[in-house]
Design a protein with these regions (language model features):
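Short, solvent-exposed coil/turn segments
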Residues: 38-40, 159-160
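Core domains of carbohydrate- and sulfate-ester-processing enzymes
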Residues: 1-38
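Active-site-proximal loop/turn and secondary-structure-junction residues that shape catalytic pockets
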Residues: 27-32, 41, 78, 108
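Short, functional N-terminal and low-complexity linear motifs
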Residues: 22-29, 53-57, 155-161
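Active-site mouth loops of central-metabolism enzymes
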Residues: 42-55
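Active-site-proximal helices and loops of the catalytic beta/alpha 8
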Residues: 1-10, 58-221
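General secondary-structure edge motif
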Residues: 36, 43-44, 150, 174
Length: 221
């Protein structure tokens, strides 16, 4: 248990909550949303513990060498100390001898917050969440949107070399906790905006490319 910060269940008292283990403290290098959003779910891994760092270094090397992947997608970055990835990514590249381009999901509409993270972790790119929300707003505005200002306040506008643009993903589709689905009528235009733009690295969602016939939520674009 000493490799974790805390959990959301006290078995002794059968109480739900966010419980910080004795002798631990939440990481300071996370988003200040809700005060401190280090804890997200399950058992929160203590990524500043030297034993945990050594194991994640070992696991990262094993995973890259076993699977042969040539890039990484990092999830829920705002809940993990930025200082961990600032060290882990360069070390993994050094140990494996691979470039391993990385893109992270830092879910925030505030481009300044994304820029701050990239300053702390220059070894990764980030998904352009502000742009996604601009596209979502445009698709639900009944045509009342100034498209000439669509890229204002976006990561691709501020730091195009490290911005990964996207229209939709698994979190934004209907039924998800972060659902902010781009309306079907606007999706072809949204993809034209990201795919035909010189700046940024575009990413196409599987569900938009092939549809999601299992649920019928999203038609193929």
């Amino acid at each position: 248990w000493t490799c974790f910060h805390g959990t959301d269940w006290d078995e002794a008292r059968h109480l739900a909550g966010v419980w910080l283990f004795e002798g631990k403290r939440w990481n300071d290098h996370v988003t200040d949303e809700l005060g401190n959003y280090d804890y997200l779910m399950g058992a929160d891994v203590h990524v500043t513990d030297p034993r945990v760092c050594a194991e994640l270094d070992r696991w990262g090397r094993w995973y890259v060498e076993t699977t042969g992947v040539d890039g990484l997608r990092l999830d829920a970055l705002k809940h993990v100390g930025a200082d961990f990835f600032a060290r882990w990514l360069p070390e993994l590249r050094r140990a494996t001898g691979r470039d391993l381009p990385a893109v992270g999901e830092y879910w925030s509409r505030d481009v300044a917050e994304l820029e701050g993270y990239l300053e702390a972790v220059p070894s990764t790119s980030l998904f352009d969440v502000p742009l996604h929300f601009h596209l979502h707003a445009a698709s639900t505005s009944n045509g009342d949107t100034d498209l000439s200002r669509l890229f204002e306040g976006t990561l691709v506008g501020a730091d195009p070399a490290r911005a990964v643009t996207f229209v939709e993903n698994h979190d934004t589709q209907p039924g998800q906790s972060l659902a902010s689905t781009i309306q079907p009528w606007f999706k072809p235009s949204a993809y034209a905006l990201v795919l035909l733009r010189e700046a940024g690295t575009p990413c196409v969602f599987w569900g938009d490319l092939f549809g999601t016939p299992e649920t019928g939520d999203l038609p193929a674009v």
